Amino acid sequence: MWQKNQTSLADFILEGLFDDSLTHLFLFSLTMVVFLIAVSGNTLTILLICIDPQLHTPMYFLLSQLSLMDLMHVSTIILKMATNYLSGKKSISFVGCATQHFLYLCLGGAECFLLAVMSYDRYVAICHPLRYAVLMNKKVGLMMAVMSWLGASVNSLIHMAILMHFPFCGPRKVYHFYCEFPAVVKLVCGDITVYETTVYISSILLLLPIFLISTSYVFILQSVIQMRSSGSKRNAFATCGSHLTVVSLWFGACIFSYMRPRSQCTLLQNKVGSVFYSIITPTLNSLIYTLRNKDVAKALRRVLRRDVITQCIQRLQLWLPRV
């Protein structure tokens, strides 16, 4: 029994995304540049929303949560991949694999729920503008964000506990650059019916955000069609444009990665899909909201025109208890 437990806690081997050739050295450098852009963009978005009082609204609070999720998502995957590449090692501990598995599932699920909440925010803003302060105030926004985090955490904790409880056999080589569940589950020795059932249930639950987003935009489209002013229509499309773009990128990448027939899946396609939604999408999200959103762009210009350090100190003093 002791030997079995020791074996189950042995390290996993990650195949990685790169090898030691010059071409892959260039690709690694490119990936790190994209990673730095993602970290910088999402961090900037979070700081702007915290610093600028005009962005202290439920809509931008939810946007800050999206940026935080993207920042954590890309860091969870890329930092370990970069460490292994630079050190020449390919191993990841059992606890490290379980942690990475939990975090990427949690952050992915939370982002799905949060995008649905953000679509509801757009629906209230366009279809019920006079009741927006009641239906979508700061307390409601905070509660929805907490529920997104909590629901995704419980779901991913169940997944992680079930998957990592199984015995693993063979060389324990994960044919991926991080501990994604389709790659890890292939190493399991034994019946995985319980885990497959859990995956099916979670998939059905994660279809709920898609339904809520679609329903919200059906009502939004109806309201926009009934608008007589072309200016109002442009404002409505501007309000929804960034969110729709992010939704399309995120769910499109997820569908490509997880909802294709197994007969059509290859290791290369799986890696490409994972790179897109775990690296490219978090990078594009911050750029989309920064470049397309006029309020965020104006906040950036305001911050650049004043002493940022002074503003940060003033904000910090407001939070610190008075002595």
UniProtKB/Swiss-Prot annotation:
CDD domains xref list: 7tmA_OR2T-like
Glycosylated position list: N5
S-S bonds: C97-C189
UniProt-annotated location(s): Cell membrane
Keyword Isomerase in annotation: no
InterPro entries: GPCR_Rhodpsn, GPCR_Rhodpsn_7TM, Olfact_rcpt
Extracellular domain ranges by topology: 1-25, 80-100, 159-195, 259-271
Protein's recorded name: Olfactory receptor 2AE1
Encoding gene (name): OR2AE1
